[in-house]
Amino acid sequence: MTHMPETPLLDQVHYPSDLRKLEDRDLPQLAREVRDEMIDAVSRTGGHLGAGLGVVELTIAIHNVFDTPNDRLIFDVGHQCYPHKILTGRRDRIRTLRQEGGISGFTRRAESEYDPFGAAHSSTSISAGLGMAVAADLDKTDRRVIAVIGDGAMSAGMAYEALNNAGALDARLIVILNDNDMSIAPPTGAMSAYLARLASGRTYMGFRDLGKKLTAYLGKNVDRAITRAVEHARGYVTGGTMFEEMGFYHIGPIDGHSFDHLLPVLRNVRDNAQGPVLIHVVTQKGKGYAPAEAAADKYHGVNKFDVITGAQAKVKPNAPSYTSVFADALVQEATFDDKIVGITAAMPSGTGLDKLQEVFPKRCFDVGIAEQHAVTFAAGLAAEGFKPFAALYSTFLQRAYDQVVHDVAIQGLPVRFPIDRAGFVGADGPTHAGSFDTTFLATLPGFVVMAAADEAELKHMVRTAAAYDLGPISFRYPRGEGVGIEMPERGQILEIGKGRIVKQGSKVALLSFGTRLADSLAAAEDLDAAGLPTTVADARFAKPLDHDLIRQLASHHEVLITIEEGSVGGFGSQVMQFLASEGLLDNGLKIRTLVMPDIWVEQAKPEVMNAMAGLDRAGIVQTVFKALGRSLIVGAAG
């Protein structure tokens, strides 16, 4: 049995107000105890470990110096928010992290007043923080706003748009750049700490503000001269940076694991800053836990693990994951076609494109957290005759919708979109669910929209996409493992807009789009047993629809049910539109569309989410019985 860590000091800290009562000399011990608590909690639930371990001292220092929740603290993405949750009244629930009915793995406004802005997608914190800082100025309050953003998230254009706007507005915004990959510049010991304290002190910050006041008083003619004077003085202390060019007062880099470095700088900024300030803090992912320090990439997101050894619990899969099937199929197709290239937005491992990178390093591109750029970059490649596969999670494709419409679809460019994590994703909840891709892609003229029913179908769709050059094409597939069917040596090229009948019946028709096919077949067994001979069809395409297949199903069955793991407005709506336009609803056809519910579905296991949505075997059977006006016999649904 695993024992709970001993945390005598942390036991006294329920909220940041308790933390502020501690002496500075007590904070290193508190940091050790927070780390122990976090490691133990995540070992039981799984979650994002490395990022949170890297910001323990920083989180404690911020809550110690600033008056949260009155002062607003925003974490970008949210992977690093676990220490924050422990210190803000949620320690008693930290072992429910990412579990059904438990607390979120990200910041959530509905969860705590200490979470002023929700996060899960990258690079939003500075924009949100700027909005809050401007609101504080308009309200004439002295409320401070702190945005903590990692160096990875700073690769997205949105972060720079916000920095540029904040500098132009001269907003009272504090941005803390958490450089946990040493990717910008390392701190240089005692001298770096001294210079950071000096630069954040009253004298130098006052000189900067004096320069701004003189500019306002004397006019724009002297603006350039005063700016040069301020930069000259600052250059002796820290040197100029691009952040200074954008209007930010830049401090650092400083050691993000040293309270002796963090506290003086944060207090100076709290007491003296008037305009936008950027503090560059260098941290180490996984700090304080040896296995995570040694392999940061393996401890970013973890399963349950043994605290002593660091060994993660891994369930042996019954079938290959959809991601790995896609990756292997793409590598296979790339060996036959040297025009195939892969594009990922900072997710090479998550999308499986790391396999393509290993085999064809010059034909695989990681563009950083920049989905908008990724899509238009792919469009440029397609315009020159290449076959780009822009592999994105469904939830992140949302960030690039204008580029999909304007740069790809309107021009009819043959960009291929492998859409991973389609449907429910489990512990990451509504922010990462792949709900909307079918809906927003199937509305676009000339777009081919597919969904794989199983891993063999996915292999067919990779080859089909590689062969299709008439316009944009997408294929969606879920997180997790396949159903364990026999795999073809190589995928087949599917006929565009043609589905297939998998099982023939006569009274009920189940038309599945995507991986709900397995549950549809299981439901058909129960319906057959109840005297309702059931046809099961795999649509394959939401656009173009298989009109002949839909006419056949509608004309020869009493009940037609569409099933998809997607939002309202998707495949089922496309089918309904066609049926209505063809007059196929005029003769008493009973049609029902099963989709993800029109709510934000909270975290749970995917199978629980599908059951709640009525997308599982039992839910499909129940929908058929209701459509027929019959009572469901107990046990009829398996």
UniProtKB/Swiss-Prot annotation:
UniProt keyword Magnesium, yes or no: yes
Binding site for thiamine diphosphate: H79, A120, H121, S122, G152, A153, N180, Y289, E371
Coiled coil segments of this chain: none
Binding sites annotated in the UniProt record for Mg(2+): D151, N180
Gene Ontology process terms (BP): 1-deoxy-D-xylulose 5-phosphate biosynthetic process; glyceraldehyde-3-phosphate metabolic process; terpenoid biosynthetic process; thiamine biosynthetic process
EC numbers for this chain: 2.2.1.7
Function: Catalyzes the acyloin condensation reaction between C atoms 2 and 3 of pyruvate and glyceraldehyde 3-phosphate to yield 1-deoxy-D-xylulose-5-phosphate (DXP).
Protein name: 1-deoxy-D-xylulose-5-phosphate synthase
Species in which this protein is naturally found: Rhizobium rhizogenes (strain K84 / ATCC BAA-868) (Agrobacterium radiobacter)
UniProt gene name: dxs
